[in-house]
Design a protein with these regions (language model features):
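Conserved ABC ATPase signature
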Residues: 36-40, 44
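ABC ATPase "signature
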Residues: 121-122, 130
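Catalytic Walker B motif of ABC-type/P-loop ATPase nucleotide-binding domains
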Residues: 61-65
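Conserved ABC ATPase "signature" region
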Residues: 13-31, 84
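Conserved catalytic motifs of ABC-family nucleotide-binding domains
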Residues: 57
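Hydrophobic anchor residue at the start of the ABC signature
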Residues: 50-51
Length: 153
């Protein structure tokens, strides 16, 4: 996490202070900082990833599928925590996700891509009420419905 800061000439004390500030922000147990990734839970790994992304205080942060491979209960808990962290950071965060519910919960605006091109940008309400093309409708409808017991049987 501190490699880039070191390469940019930060003093060890400044790095340690920034790491501690970010550790508190993401509510990470201090004992985890010396761990290898395989020793961490999925939620701990995601917190460390957010710390790495925020280390150099960028104007914009990019998080690519930060909830991937997490079980649903941890995922929901981490989503709540991320929302709070994003607000406290006061940064623009670009979040890549295939989970529309996650995008709706975490984002102020959603940009839907299809085959490498932007299909529509706006709020969830905009996408829902004024879909730009049939793909937008299909994407939203596919994620709004779960199979019922009759469909599973």
């Amino acid at each position: 996490m501190s490699l880039i800061a070191t390469l940019r000439g930060w003093r060890a004390q400044k790095i340690a202070e920034r790491v501690e500030e970010l550790r508190k922000l993401v509510d990470l147990d201090p004992a985890v900082l010396g761990s290898f990734p395989f020793e961490m839970s999925g939620g701990q790994q995601q917190r460390v990833a957010i710390m790495r992304a925020a280390m150099m205080d960028p104007a914009v942060m990019l998080l690519d599928e930060p909830m991937a491979a997490l079980d649903p209960l941890i995922r929901r808990s981490l989503q709540r925590e991320l929302k709070s962290i994003f607000q406290r950071l006061g940064k623009t965060v670009l979040l890549v996700t295939h989970d529309l519910g996650e995008a709706v919960y975490l984002a102020d605006a959603i940009t839907l891509l299809h085959e490498g091109r932007v299909v529509q940008s706006g709020t969830y309400r905009d996408l829902l009420l004024h879909p730009a093309d049939p793909f937008v409708t299909q994407f939203i409808n596919a994620q709004r419905t779960l199979p019922d017991a009759a469909e599973i049987a």
